[in-house]
Swiss-Prot record:
This is 2-succinylbenzoate--CoA ligase. Belongs to the ATP-dependent AMP-binding enzyme family. MenE subfamily. Pfam families: AMP-binding, AMP-binding_C. HAMAP family: MenE. It comes from Geobacillus sp. (strain WCH70). It catalyses: 2-succinylbenzoate + ATP + CoA = 2-succinylbenzoyl-CoA + AMP + diphosphate. Keywords: ATP-binding, Ligase, Menaquinone biosynthesis, Nucleotide-binding.
Length: 492
Protein backbone atom coordinates (compact mmCIF):
# COMPACT_ATOMS: atom_id res chain seq x y z
CA UNK A 1 0.00 0.00 0.00
CA UNK A 2 1.38 3.37 -1.04
CA UNK A 3 1.99 5.91 1.71
CA UNK A 4 0.43 9.30 1.05
CA UNK A 5 0.36 12.57 2.95
CA UNK A 6 -1.68 15.74 2.41
CA UNK A 7 -0.16 18.31 0.05
CA UNK A 8 2.32 20.09 2.31
CA UNK A 9 1.58 23.72 1.49
CA UNK A 10 -2.17 23.13 1.29
CA UNK A 11 -2.14 21.47 4.70
CA UNK A 12 0.08 24.18 6.15
CA UNK A 13 -2.20 26.93 4.81
CA UNK A 14 -5.15 25.13 6.42
CA UNK A 15 -3.41 24.63 9.79
CA UNK A 16 -1.66 27.99 10.22
CA UNK A 17 -3.02 30.34 7.54
CA UNK A 18 -1.94 33.60 9.20
CA UNK A 19 1.60 32.54 10.08
CA UNK A 20 4.32 34.20 7.99
CA UNK A 21 5.71 31.79 5.39
CA UNK A 22 8.31 33.94 3.68
CA UNK A 23 10.09 37.29 3.86
CA UNK A 24 12.32 38.69 1.13
CA UNK A 25 13.28 42.19 2.24
CA UNK A 26 10.55 43.75 0.14
CA UNK A 27 7.53 42.14 1.69
CA UNK A 28 6.12 39.02 3.30
CA UNK A 29 3.47 36.40 2.69
CA UNK A 30 1.47 34.22 5.04
CA UNK A 31 1.07 30.54 4.29
CA UNK A 32 -2.47 31.21 3.04
CA UNK A 33 -1.25 34.00 0.77
CA UNK A 34 1.53 31.76 -0.51
CA UNK A 35 -0.99 28.98 -1.17
CA UNK A 36 -3.23 31.38 -3.11
CA UNK A 37 -0.28 32.63 -5.17
CA UNK A 38 0.78 29.05 -5.89
CA UNK A 39 -2.70 28.10 -7.10
CA UNK A 40 -2.60 31.02 -9.53
CA UNK A 41 0.88 30.07 -10.77
CA UNK A 42 -0.26 26.46 -11.22
CA UNK A 43 -3.24 27.53 -13.34
CA UNK A 44 -1.00 29.78 -15.43
CA UNK A 45 1.45 26.91 -15.93
CA UNK A 46 -1.43 24.67 -16.94
CA UNK A 47 -2.26 27.24 -19.62
CA UNK A 48 1.19 26.68 -21.15
CA UNK A 49 0.56 22.94 -21.35
CA UNK A 50 2.35 21.68 -18.24
CA UNK A 51 0.76 18.40 -17.15
CA UNK A 52 1.10 15.85 -14.39
CA UNK A 53 4.23 13.73 -14.80
CA UNK A 54 6.09 16.30 -16.94
CA UNK A 55 9.68 17.10 -16.04
CA UNK A 56 9.90 20.88 -15.84
CA UNK A 57 13.22 22.66 -15.29
CA UNK A 58 13.60 25.77 -13.17
CA UNK A 59 16.46 28.10 -14.06
CA UNK A 60 16.08 30.86 -11.51
CA UNK A 61 17.83 32.63 -8.68
CA UNK A 62 16.38 32.63 -5.18
CA UNK A 63 13.09 34.52 -4.97
CA UNK A 64 9.54 34.18 -3.71
CA UNK A 65 8.55 33.62 -7.34
CA UNK A 66 10.89 30.62 -7.53
CA UNK A 67 9.30 29.16 -4.38
CA UNK A 68 5.86 29.66 -5.91
CA UNK A 69 6.89 27.94 -9.15
CA UNK A 70 8.30 24.88 -7.35
CA UNK A 71 5.13 24.46 -5.28
CA UNK A 72 2.92 25.18 -8.31
CA UNK A 73 4.55 22.40 -10.31
CA UNK A 74 3.99 20.03 -7.40
CA UNK A 75 0.34 21.13 -7.21
CA UNK A 76 0.02 20.02 -10.85
CA UNK A 77 1.95 16.81 -10.22
CA UNK A 78 4.96 17.72 -12.36
CA UNK A 79 8.54 16.81 -11.47
CA UNK A 80 10.83 19.77 -10.76
CA UNK A 81 14.32 19.77 -12.27
CA UNK A 82 16.48 22.33 -10.42
CA UNK A 83 19.19 23.87 -12.60
CA UNK A 84 22.32 25.59 -11.31
CA UNK A 85 22.28 29.19 -12.58
CA UNK A 86 26.08 29.14 -12.82
CA UNK A 87 26.07 26.52 -15.58
CA UNK A 88 27.21 27.47 -19.06
CA UNK A 89 24.79 27.19 -21.96
CA UNK A 90 26.60 24.01 -23.03
CA UNK A 91 26.28 22.35 -19.61
CA UNK A 92 22.67 23.42 -19.26
CA UNK A 93 21.70 22.12 -22.70
CA UNK A 94 23.24 18.73 -21.94
CA UNK A 95 21.31 18.34 -18.68
CA UNK A 96 18.02 19.47 -20.20
CA UNK A 97 18.37 16.96 -23.03
CA UNK A 98 19.47 14.12 -20.75
CA UNK A 99 16.59 14.70 -18.33
CA UNK A 100 13.87 14.79 -20.96
CA UNK A 101 12.55 18.09 -19.59
CA UNK A 102 9.76 19.57 -21.70
CA UNK A 103 9.71 23.11 -20.29
CA UNK A 104 12.10 25.55 -18.61
CA UNK A 105 10.85 28.28 -16.30
CA UNK A 106 13.50 31.00 -16.22
CA UNK A 107 14.23 34.41 -14.81
CA UNK A 108 14.01 36.93 -17.64
CA UNK A 109 17.70 37.83 -17.38
CA UNK A 110 18.76 34.16 -17.60
CA UNK A 111 16.57 33.06 -20.50
CA UNK A 112 19.12 33.83 -23.22
CA UNK A 113 21.46 31.20 -21.74
CA UNK A 114 19.05 28.41 -22.67
CA UNK A 115 19.77 26.63 -25.96
CA UNK A 116 18.09 23.77 -27.79
CA UNK A 117 14.55 22.88 -28.77
CA UNK A 118 12.80 23.32 -25.45
CA UNK A 119 9.91 25.57 -24.49
CA UNK A 120 11.17 28.46 -22.35
CA UNK A 121 8.72 30.25 -20.06
CA UNK A 122 10.07 33.50 -18.65
CA UNK A 123 8.69 34.87 -15.40
CA UNK A 124 7.32 37.98 -17.10
CA UNK A 125 5.56 35.79 -19.66
CA UNK A 126 4.18 33.46 -16.98
CA UNK A 127 2.86 36.32 -14.87
CA UNK A 128 0.88 37.70 -17.83
CA UNK A 129 -0.77 34.41 -18.80
CA UNK A 130 -4.46 33.70 -18.19
CA UNK A 131 -5.34 30.88 -15.82
CA UNK A 132 -6.59 27.46 -16.87
CA UNK A 133 -8.39 25.05 -14.58
CA UNK A 134 -6.27 22.12 -13.45
CA UNK A 135 -6.75 19.35 -10.91
CA UNK A 136 -4.49 19.97 -7.93
CA UNK A 137 -2.67 17.15 -6.18
CA UNK A 138 -4.40 16.92 -2.80
CA UNK A 139 -1.93 14.27 -1.63
CA UNK A 140 1.75 13.56 -2.17
CA UNK A 141 2.70 9.91 -2.59
CA UNK A 142 5.95 9.09 -0.83
CA UNK A 143 7.28 7.02 -3.74
CA UNK A 144 6.71 9.74 -6.34
CA UNK A 145 9.62 11.80 -7.63
CA UNK A 146 9.37 15.40 -6.40
CA UNK A 147 12.64 16.86 -7.65
CA UNK A 148 15.73 16.08 -9.71
CA UNK A 149 19.17 17.62 -9.19
CA UNK A 150 22.20 16.84 -11.30
CA UNK A 151 25.45 15.86 -9.65
CA UNK A 152 28.60 14.73 -11.42
CA UNK A 153 30.03 11.31 -10.75
CA UNK A 154 33.70 10.40 -10.75
CA UNK A 155 33.38 9.76 -14.49
CA UNK A 156 32.59 13.45 -14.88
CA UNK A 157 29.25 12.71 -16.53
CA UNK A 158 26.45 14.44 -14.61
CA UNK A 159 23.72 12.21 -13.18
CA UNK A 160 20.20 13.25 -12.24
CA UNK A 161 19.53 12.39 -8.61
CA UNK A 162 15.92 11.34 -8.04
CA UNK A 163 14.50 12.88 -4.87
CA UNK A 164 11.13 11.56 -3.71
CA UNK A 165 8.58 13.21 -1.45
CA UNK A 166 9.59 10.62 1.14
CA UNK A 167 13.24 11.72 0.89
CA UNK A 168 12.34 15.36 1.54
CA UNK A 169 9.86 14.47 4.32
CA UNK A 170 12.32 12.39 6.31
CA UNK A 171 15.13 14.86 5.73
CA UNK A 172 12.94 17.52 7.33
CA UNK A 173 11.92 15.23 10.20
CA UNK A 174 15.52 14.15 10.83
CA UNK A 175 16.64 17.77 10.97
CA UNK A 176 13.83 18.73 13.37
CA UNK A 177 14.64 15.83 15.69
CA UNK A 178 18.25 17.02 15.70
CA UNK A 179 17.91 20.81 15.88
CA UNK A 180 14.49 21.04 17.50
CA UNK A 181 11.73 23.47 16.60
CA UNK A 182 10.95 26.84 18.16
CA UNK A 183 7.77 28.81 17.65
CA UNK A 184 9.68 31.90 16.54
CA UNK A 185 12.12 30.14 14.21
CA UNK A 186 12.98 31.82 10.92
CA UNK A 187 15.52 30.16 8.61
CA UNK A 188 17.72 32.43 6.51
CA UNK A 189 17.94 31.00 2.98
CA UNK A 190 21.15 32.52 1.61
CA UNK A 191 22.19 29.33 -0.20
CA UNK A 192 20.59 28.69 -3.61
CA UNK A 193 17.40 26.68 -3.94
CA UNK A 194 18.95 24.78 -6.85
CA UNK A 195 21.25 23.16 -4.25
CA UNK A 196 19.81 20.65 -1.83
CA UNK A 197 21.00 22.81 1.08
CA UNK A 198 18.68 25.57 -0.14
CA UNK A 199 15.76 23.47 -1.36
CA UNK A 200 15.63 21.60 1.96
CA UNK A 201 14.97 24.92 3.76
CA UNK A 202 11.96 25.49 1.52
CA UNK A 203 10.65 21.99 2.22
CA UNK A 204 11.15 22.35 5.98
CA UNK A 205 9.32 25.67 5.97
CA UNK A 206 6.00 24.21 4.84
CA UNK A 207 6.38 20.98 6.82
CA UNK A 208 7.28 22.76 10.08
CA UNK A 209 5.17 25.86 9.59
CA UNK A 210 8.39 27.87 9.90
CA UNK A 211 9.13 31.26 8.38
CA UNK A 212 12.01 31.66 5.98
CA UNK A 213 13.87 34.75 4.83
CA UNK A 214 14.93 34.55 1.18
CA UNK A 215 18.12 36.19 -0.08
CA UNK A 216 18.49 36.39 -3.86
CA UNK A 217 22.26 36.26 -3.39
CA UNK A 218 24.40 35.91 -0.29
CA UNK A 219 25.33 39.20 1.38
CA UNK A 220 27.44 38.90 4.55
CA UNK A 221 26.56 42.38 5.82
CA UNK A 222 22.83 41.85 5.30
CA UNK A 223 22.96 38.38 6.88
CA UNK A 224 24.62 39.82 9.99
CA UNK A 225 22.03 42.60 10.18
CA UNK A 226 19.21 40.05 10.09
CA UNK A 227 20.80 37.89 12.78
CA UNK A 228 21.72 40.79 15.09
CA UNK A 229 18.26 42.29 14.57
CA UNK A 230 16.68 39.06 15.77
CA UNK A 231 14.94 38.50 12.44
CA UNK A 232 16.37 35.00 11.83
CA UNK A 233 17.25 32.15 14.19
CA UNK A 234 18.87 29.57 11.87
CA UNK A 235 21.11 29.86 8.82
CA UNK A 236 22.74 27.40 6.41
CA UNK A 237 26.28 28.28 5.27
CA UNK A 238 29.53 26.94 3.86
CA UNK A 239 32.90 27.96 5.33
CA UNK A 240 33.56 30.74 2.80
CA UNK A 241 30.24 32.40 3.68
CA UNK A 242 30.86 32.11 7.41
CA UNK A 243 34.35 33.60 7.08
CA UNK A 244 32.92 36.66 5.31
CA UNK A 245 30.26 37.07 7.98
CA UNK A 246 32.81 36.92 10.80
CA UNK A 247 35.01 39.48 9.02
CA UNK A 248 32.03 41.83 8.74
CA UNK A 249 30.91 41.10 12.32
CA UNK A 250 34.04 42.57 13.88
CA UNK A 251 33.69 42.90 17.66
CA UNK A 252 29.93 42.45 17.59
CA UNK A 253 28.27 39.25 18.77
CA UNK A 254 25.12 37.44 17.73
CA UNK A 255 22.16 37.53 20.13
CA UNK A 256 20.93 34.43 21.96
CA UNK A 257 17.92 34.37 19.63
CA UNK A 258 20.26 33.01 16.93
CA UNK A 259 20.50 29.32 17.75
CA UNK A 260 22.02 27.47 14.79
CA UNK A 261 24.65 28.07 12.12
CA UNK A 262 24.38 24.92 9.99
CA UNK A 263 27.78 24.51 8.35
CA UNK A 264 28.19 22.22 5.35
CA UNK A 265 30.29 22.01 2.21
CA UNK A 266 33.25 20.17 3.74
CA UNK A 267 35.10 20.12 7.07
CA UNK A 268 35.61 23.55 8.61
CA UNK A 269 39.11 24.98 9.18
CA UNK A 270 40.19 24.84 12.84
CA UNK A 271 40.84 28.62 13.15
CA UNK A 272 37.31 29.32 11.91
CA UNK A 273 35.79 27.01 14.52
CA UNK A 274 37.88 28.56 17.28
CA UNK A 275 36.72 32.06 16.34
CA UNK A 276 33.11 30.85 16.31
CA UNK A 277 33.60 29.30 19.74
CA UNK A 278 35.10 32.53 21.11
CA UNK A 279 32.20 34.54 19.71
CA UNK A 280 29.60 32.08 20.96
CA UNK A 281 28.36 31.24 17.47
CA UNK A 282 26.45 27.93 17.62
CA UNK A 283 28.01 26.06 14.70
CA UNK A 284 26.59 22.67 13.68
CA UNK A 285 28.94 20.90 11.24
CA UNK A 286 27.18 18.58 8.80
CA UNK A 287 27.79 15.88 6.22
CA UNK A 288 25.35 15.27 3.43
CA UNK A 289 24.87 15.25 -0.32
CA UNK A 290 22.28 15.58 -3.03
CA UNK A 291 21.61 11.84 -2.76
CA UNK A 292 20.64 12.11 0.93
CA UNK A 293 18.31 15.10 0.46
CA UNK A 294 20.60 17.31 2.59
CA UNK A 295 22.36 16.45 5.86
CA UNK A 296 22.61 12.85 7.02
CA UNK A 297 25.09 13.47 9.86
CA UNK A 298 25.55 16.52 12.06
CA UNK A 299 27.97 17.57 14.79
CA UNK A 300 26.44 19.53 17.65
CA UNK A 301 28.24 22.70 18.86
CA UNK A 302 29.28 21.18 22.18
CA UNK A 303 31.56 18.81 20.25
CA UNK A 304 32.88 21.39 17.76
CA UNK A 305 36.35 21.50 19.34
CA UNK A 306 36.61 18.17 21.20
CA UNK A 307 35.65 16.38 17.99
CA UNK A 308 37.35 18.85 15.68
CA UNK A 309 36.92 17.97 12.02
CA UNK A 310 34.11 15.51 12.66
CA UNK A 311 30.83 15.60 10.77
CA UNK A 312 29.07 14.15 13.80
CA UNK A 313 26.63 11.28 14.09
CA UNK A 314 23.80 10.20 11.78
CA UNK A 315 20.41 11.88 12.13
CA UNK A 316 17.73 9.88 13.90
CA UNK A 317 16.04 8.16 10.89
CA UNK A 318 19.38 7.33 9.26
CA UNK A 319 22.20 4.83 9.60
CA UNK A 320 25.85 5.16 8.72
CA UNK A 321 28.80 2.81 8.65
CA UNK A 322 32.27 2.47 7.18
CA UNK A 323 33.09 -0.47 4.90
CA UNK A 324 36.49 -1.73 3.84
CA UNK A 325 36.87 -4.67 1.46
CA UNK A 326 33.22 -5.61 1.98
CA UNK A 327 33.47 -5.67 5.77
CA UNK A 328 32.43 -3.17 8.43
CA UNK A 329 35.57 -1.27 9.39
CA UNK A 330 36.98 -1.01 12.88
CA UNK A 331 37.07 2.35 14.73
CA UNK A 332 39.56 4.74 13.08
CA UNK A 333 39.95 2.39 10.09
CA UNK A 334 39.39 4.36 6.86
CA UNK A 335 36.91 3.00 4.35
CA UNK A 336 33.92 3.94 2.24
CA UNK A 337 31.10 5.85 3.91
CA UNK A 338 27.88 3.87 3.47
CA UNK A 339 24.49 5.27 4.47
CA UNK A 340 20.91 4.11 4.75
CA UNK A 341 17.63 5.79 5.52
CA UNK A 342 14.30 7.03 4.14
CA UNK A 343 15.99 10.28 3.07
CA UNK A 344 18.34 8.44 0.68
CA UNK A 345 17.64 8.60 -3.07
CA UNK A 346 16.08 5.70 -4.95
CA UNK A 347 18.62 6.18 -7.73
CA UNK A 348 19.71 8.13 -10.78
CA UNK A 349 17.58 9.23 -13.73
CA UNK A 350 18.10 6.96 -16.78
CA UNK A 351 21.16 5.39 -15.08
CA UNK A 352 20.23 1.85 -13.96
CA UNK A 353 23.88 0.76 -13.92
CA UNK A 354 24.96 3.70 -11.76
CA UNK A 355 21.99 3.10 -9.46
CA UNK A 356 22.81 -0.59 -9.07
CA UNK A 357 26.42 0.26 -8.32
CA UNK A 358 25.55 2.89 -5.70
CA UNK A 359 22.67 1.14 -3.93
CA UNK A 360 23.35 -2.38 -2.72
CA UNK A 361 21.32 -4.25 -0.15
CA UNK A 362 19.44 -1.11 0.75
CA UNK A 363 22.66 0.79 1.53
CA UNK A 364 23.96 3.75 -0.48
CA UNK A 365 27.68 3.65 -1.22
CA UNK A 366 28.76 7.27 -1.25
CA UNK A 367 32.24 6.87 -2.73
CA UNK A 368 33.46 9.12 0.07
CA UNK A 369 36.24 7.93 2.34
CA UNK A 370 36.14 8.38 6.09
CA UNK A 371 36.31 6.70 9.46
CA UNK A 372 34.30 6.52 12.67
CA UNK A 373 35.95 6.94 16.08
CA UNK A 374 35.23 4.85 19.17
CA UNK A 375 32.36 7.17 20.12
CA UNK A 376 30.60 6.84 16.75
CA UNK A 377 31.60 10.21 15.31
CA UNK A 378 32.19 10.38 11.56
CA UNK A 379 35.31 11.93 10.05
CA UNK A 380 35.32 12.52 6.29
CA UNK A 381 38.77 12.09 4.75
CA UNK A 382 38.08 12.47 1.05
CA UNK A 383 34.95 13.72 -0.61
CA UNK A 384 34.20 11.28 -3.38
CA UNK A 385 37.85 10.42 -3.57
CA UNK A 386 38.95 13.32 -5.74
CA UNK A 387 36.10 15.77 -5.30
CA UNK A 388 37.06 19.43 -4.98
CA UNK A 389 34.81 21.55 -2.77
CA UNK A 390 35.18 25.19 -3.75
CA UNK A 391 33.09 27.66 -1.78
CA UNK A 392 30.56 24.92 -1.10
CA UNK A 393 30.26 23.98 -4.78
CA UNK A 394 31.14 20.44 -5.82
CA UNK A 395 33.79 20.43 -8.54
CA UNK A 396 34.63 17.12 -10.19
CA UNK A 397 38.12 16.78 -11.70
CA UNK A 398 37.02 14.37 -14.43
CA UNK A 399 34.53 16.89 -15.81
CA UNK A 400 37.26 19.53 -16.16
CA UNK A 401 39.68 16.96 -17.59
CA UNK A 402 37.13 16.00 -20.24
CA UNK A 403 36.91 19.62 -21.40
CA UNK A 404 40.70 20.03 -21.49
CA UNK A 405 41.09 16.77 -23.41
CA UNK A 406 38.67 18.04 -26.04
CA UNK A 407 41.19 20.76 -26.97
CA UNK A 408 43.19 19.81 -30.07
CA UNK A 409 46.54 20.59 -28.41
CA UNK A 410 45.99 18.53 -25.25
CA UNK A 411 47.15 14.92 -25.06
CA UNK A 412 46.64 14.28 -21.34
CA UNK A 413 45.07 16.23 -18.49
CA UNK A 414 44.78 15.80 -14.75
CA UNK A 415 42.97 17.99 -12.23
CA UNK A 416 43.15 18.20 -8.46
CA UNK A 417 42.25 20.68 -5.74
CA UNK A 418 44.72 23.06 -4.14
CA UNK A 419 44.14 25.04 -0.96
CA UNK A 420 42.70 28.53 -1.23
CA UNK A 421 42.17 30.99 1.63
CA UNK A 422 38.89 32.29 0.23
CA UNK A 423 37.21 29.23 -1.28
CA UNK A 424 38.76 26.39 0.71
CA UNK A 425 39.87 24.68 -2.49
CA UNK A 426 40.17 25.61 -6.16
CA UNK A 427 40.85 23.38 -9.18
CA UNK A 428 44.39 23.11 -10.52
CA UNK A 429 45.15 21.44 -13.86
CA UNK A 430 48.19 19.61 -15.23
CA UNK A 431 48.42 19.29 -19.00
CA UNK A 432 50.60 17.31 -21.38
CA UNK A 433 50.63 18.93 -24.81
CA UNK A 434 50.51 16.95 -28.03
CA UNK A 435 53.77 16.84 -29.95
CA UNK A 436 53.87 19.55 -32.58
CA UNK A 437 51.11 21.60 -30.97
CA UNK A 438 51.40 24.87 -29.10
CA UNK A 439 48.92 26.30 -26.60
CA UNK A 440 49.24 28.78 -23.73
CA UNK A 441 47.76 28.76 -20.24
CA UNK A 442 45.56 31.72 -21.11
CA UNK A 443 44.24 30.00 -24.24
CA UNK A 444 43.30 26.92 -22.22
CA UNK A 445 41.54 29.03 -19.60
CA UNK A 446 39.56 30.81 -22.32
CA UNK A 447 38.68 27.43 -23.80
CA UNK A 448 37.42 26.25 -20.41
CA UNK A 449 35.36 29.43 -19.99
CA UNK A 450 33.31 28.46 -23.03
CA UNK A 451 32.45 25.04 -21.61
CA UNK A 452 32.50 25.28 -17.82
CA UNK A 453 30.92 27.33 -15.05
CA UNK A 454 33.30 29.93 -13.62
CA UNK A 455 33.97 28.06 -10.38
CA UNK A 456 35.10 24.99 -12.34
CA UNK A 457 37.76 26.79 -14.39
CA UNK A 458 41.28 25.84 -13.22
CA UNK A 459 42.89 28.67 -11.28
CA UNK A 460 46.34 27.30 -12.16
CA UNK A 461 47.45 25.27 -15.18
CA UNK A 462 50.86 23.60 -15.38
CA UNK A 463 52.42 22.01 -18.45
CA UNK A 464 54.14 18.69 -17.67
CA UNK A 465 55.96 15.93 -19.55
CA UNK A 466 54.05 13.07 -17.92
CA UNK A 467 51.13 12.53 -15.57
CA UNK A 468 51.40 10.04 -12.68
CA UNK A 469 49.63 6.75 -13.42
CA UNK A 470 49.52 3.30 -11.88
CA UNK A 471 50.21 -0.02 -13.58
CA UNK A 472 46.79 -0.08 -15.16
CA UNK A 473 47.32 3.48 -16.42
CA UNK A 474 44.80 4.97 -14.03
CA UNK A 475 45.53 8.61 -13.29
CA UNK A 476 46.83 9.10 -9.75
CA UNK A 477 45.29 12.46 -8.93
CA UNK A 478 46.58 12.48 -5.37
CA UNK A 479 50.13 12.68 -6.77
CA UNK A 480 49.48 15.65 -9.05
CA UNK A 481 50.42 18.25 -6.43
CA UNK A 482 53.94 16.85 -6.45
CA UNK A 483 54.31 18.26 -9.98
CA UNK A 484 53.97 21.85 -8.76
CA UNK A 485 57.44 23.45 -9.00
CA UNK A 486 59.20 24.20 -5.72
CA UNK A 487 60.01 27.72 -6.89
CA UNK A 488 56.35 28.50 -7.42
CA UNK A 489 55.96 31.63 -9.52
CA UNK A 490 52.58 30.96 -11.04
CA UNK A 491 51.59 28.73 -13.91
CA UNK A 492 54.32 27.50 -16.20
Amino acid sequence: MQTSIPNWLMQRAFLTPERIAVYDGQGKKTFMELHESVMKRARQLANTGVRKGDIVAIFMKNSVAMIECIHALHYIGAIVLLQNTRLTSHELAWQLKDSGAVYVIADDELADRIEGNIRVITMSELSALPEENVEFQQYYHFDDIATIMYTSGTTGKPKGVLQTYENHWWSAIGSALNLGLNENDCWLAAVPFFHISGLSIMMRSVIYGMSMYVMRAFDAKKANELIIGGKVTIMSVVSAMLQKMIADLGERRYPETFRCMLLGGGPAPKPLLEVCKAKGIPVYQTYGMTETASQIATLAPEYSLTKLGSAGKPLFPSQLRIEKDGQVARPYEPGEIVVKGPNVTKGYLHRPDATAKAIRGGWFYTGDIGYIDEDGFLYVLDRRSDLIISGGENVYPAEIEAVLLSHEAVEEAGVTGIDDETWGQVPCAFVKRKRGYSVTVEQLKQFCQAHLAKYKIPKQIYFVDELPRNASQKLLRHQLKQLIPNNENGAL
